[in-house]
Structure formats: structure tokens, C-alpha cells
Regions:
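Terminal low-complexity tails and localization/encapsulation signals of metabolic enzymes
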Residues: 1-3, 244-258
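Conserved CoA-thioester-binding segment of acyl-CoA-metabolizing enzymes
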Residues: 1-56, 89
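Terminal peptide-recognition signature
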Residues: 17, 21, 36, 53, ...
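Crotonase-fold acyl-CoA enzyme core
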Residues: 89-204, 231, 235-236, 241-244, ...
Length: 258
């Protein structure tokens, strides 16, 4: 499928989805978000083993497009945020690990998009912000994903002050996994997505789904959820192949996909 504001490319087992509206600072307008969600759905239904989310241009993403919201009625605003929620949920719903490749600024819904990815690598010049606290519309929905990455106090500091944080701080707070020199960003992303995608694709997909199902439950309910999933997953052919290959001291051959 061809998109207007998104590029997709597959190299070996990895699909790269690239925000490609640099003249608008990759603002997440309604049509852009629909395309991003569609691109992730397509990648998720493929036999790819990993997905990279990247961006072209001077920033990763400037967040929501104010042009969509200025003068909008309540129904239009609700539609905009429903589409946004669907896009964020789709990133986490696909079975493959998703790695954000972050350069320059990721702000507001752009920061939310990074937080929604399973993993993230940032160049050392990257920065992150929830600037609504300095303006007229608080970053209500970006806080949903960001707070789940960095906790209440740090998320509220970002949102209430509107101040950006640098890449090293983002890593210390848990918003990104690691920070590398800008020149090493592509290599670091390639390495991480390859390592995150190895093993049984079915097992990895079930593992990702199970993580998001249990992570916000209380501990007892989380163990019940994870225990049932792990029990049923142990019955799959790939799980049995993993057990047998270990016992037989040979390389496993996995054949199942989500």
C-alpha cells in the first residue's frame, strides 16, 4: 500500500515505518495518524520479525496538528483523539517488537508515540517534551503513555512545567532504552531490533500481548493472567521445539507465527 505521509520499507525480517512530513515537522494530523495505524496493521499481519518507527526531517514529531483542533467542534475533537488512541494501541497490539528510532525533538503526541513503542533508542541530540502545560491545552492523552513509562512525579514534572528533557535524562527516567551518538543511531537500532526479534515469532508475539495485558493489573491478577498464558503457550509446537532442542543440544528450528 502507498501512503502520502508515511514511508514503509522492508529489509530482511524488519519493516521500517517512517513519518515523512518534514515540512510540517511530522505533525500527527488526522490523515497522518490513520496512515500510521494502517502501516502498523500491515506490518503486524506480515511475517516480519521486528518493526522500526523512524522519522524524516528536522524533528521526530511535533505532536498533534493544531490546525485539526483550532475551531473544531466537540465531535471532531473526539474523533481526532479516538484516532490517536487507536494508533497508539495498534503499535502495542501488533505481535512484533516495535523500536522507536528517535532523533531531535519528540513533543506532545510525538513523545506519546515514543512511549507507546515497545523499545526506543535516541540519538544524543534528541529531546522530549509535553509542552501543553505552558500553553492552552494540557497534554492529557500523552500523559497516559508517558506516565506508564516514567511514573507519576516525573510525568507530571514534564506536563506541568512543559520543559523538555534531554536524551540522557529520558534514558535515566525510562522513556528510552539507550542513548547513542547521533552517527551511531541507525546501527544501534538495527542491533536492538534484531536481538528483540530473535527466537520464536509466536512466542514473542504471545509474550508482548501478555505483557500489556498484565502490566496494569494487581500482582495476584497479573500472575493469574501470565500463568494461564504461559501454560497454554507451553503447549505450542515452538515451545516444545525449544525444550527438545535444549535437551538434545541442537539449534532450535521455529516455524510458528502469531
Amino acid at each position: 500500500m502507498t501512503y502520502q505521509h508515511v514511508l514503509t520499507d522492508r529489509c530482511d525480517d524488519v519493516v521500517t515505518i517512517t513519518l515523512d512530513r518534514p515540512e510540517k515537522r511530522n505533525a500527527l494530523a488526522l490523515d497522518v495518524m490513520l496512515e500510521v495505524a494502517a502501516a502498523f496493521e500491515a506490518a503486524g499481519s506480515s511475517d516480519a520479525l521486528g518493526v522500526v518507527l523512524a522519522a524524516n526531517g528536522p524533528v521526530f514529531s511535533a505532536g498533534h496538528n493544531f490546525g485539526d483542533m483550532a475551531g473544531a467542534d466537540l465531535d471532531a475533537a473526539r474523533e481526532l483523539f479516538e484516532v490517536c488512541h487507536n494508533m497508539m494501541d495498534t503499535v502495542q497490539a501488533i505481535p512484533q517488537p516495535v523500536v522507536a528510532r528517535v532523533h531531535a525533538l519528540a513533543t506532545a503526541a510525538g513523545c506519546q508515540l515514543v512511549a507507546s513503542c515497545d523499545l526506543a533508542v535516541a540519538g544524543e541530540s534528541a529531546s522530549f517534551a509535553l509542552p501543553g502545560g505552558k500553553g492552552g491545552l494540557f497534554c492529557h492523552t500523552p500523559l497516559v503513555a508517558v506516565a506508564r513509562n516514567i511514573g507519576r512525579k516525573r510525568a507530571l514534572e514534564l506536563a506541568l512545567t512543559g520543559d523538555p528533557i534531554d536524551a540522557r535524562t529520558a534514558a535515566d527516567w525510562g522513556l528510552v532504552n539507550r542513548v547513542v551518538a547521533d552517527a551511531e543511531l541507525d546501527a544501534a537500532v538495527t542491533d536492538l531490533v534484531a536481538r528483540a526479534g530473535r527466537g520464536s515469532a509466536l512466542s514473542k508475539g504471545l509474550g508482548k500481548r501478555g505483557f500489556y495485558e498484565q502490566i496494569d493489573l494487581d500482582q495476584s491478577a497479573a500472575y493469574e493472567c501470565a500463568g494461564e498464558l504461559m501454560s497454554t503457550a507451553a503447549m505450542t509446537d515452538d515451545a516444545q521445539e525449544g525444550f527438545n532442542s535444549f535437551l538434545e543440544k541442537r539449534r532450535a528450528v521455529f516455524t510458528q507465527y502469531p
